[in-house]
Amino acid sequence: PYGCDVIVRRNQRSLAFILTRYSDQLAILNQVSIGAHPSYNDRENFGRVSLSLERDELMADLRYQICALKGMTESFGAVLHHVKPHGALYNDMVHDQDLAEDFIKLVKQIDPNLKIFTLANSSVIELCKKHNVQGVNEGFADRRYDLTIARWDHLRV
C-alpha cells in the first residue's frame, strides 16, 4: 500500500543518478511500490514551471524519464508500479485534456499495466477510463476536502 515516486532527469550528474538508484533499491528492500515522477525538464524550478514545448519534444522527454526508471527498476528485479506527473505537468494535465490524453497514451504504450496517479475526481481519471488505463485518485494530506473529495481550502476554520 505504500508508494515511492522517483524523478529521473536527462543528463543527471552522477550523484543524482546514485541517489535515484539508491531510492529505487531502498524502496525494493522495504517492499514499497516504485513510481516514476516525470515532469517538465525545468531544473531551475524543479519542474514547477510550465514549459512551452512542441508536444513531440515533451512526450519524448517524458518517455525518457519513465523508461529510464522502468529499466533501472527492472534491472533490480522489481517492476515499476505507477506514474505520477510532477509539479506543473500534474496541474497542466488537469486543465489541458489534450495534454492529459497524450500523456495517458504514452504511459499505455510504455506499459499498459502502469497506473497513473492524478487529482481525485479530475477529468484525467475519466480519460484514463476511456483509454483502459487504471487511474488512481489522489488526495493530499495538507489540503482540505469535503466528503466528495472536492477541495475547500478557501474556507477558514
State what each model feature region is.
Residues 21-35, 74-77:
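Acidic (Asp/Glu)-rich catalytic clusters
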Residues 5-13, 39-45, 86-90, 119-121, ...:
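Active-site beta-loop-alpha junctions enriched in small/polar residues
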Residues 2-4, 34-38, 81-85, 116-118, ...:
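Hydrophobic faces of well-ordered beta-strands that scaffold small-molecule active sites
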Residues 2-10, 44-59, 94-96, 110, ...:
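Glycine-rich tight-turn/loop motif centered on a GG-T
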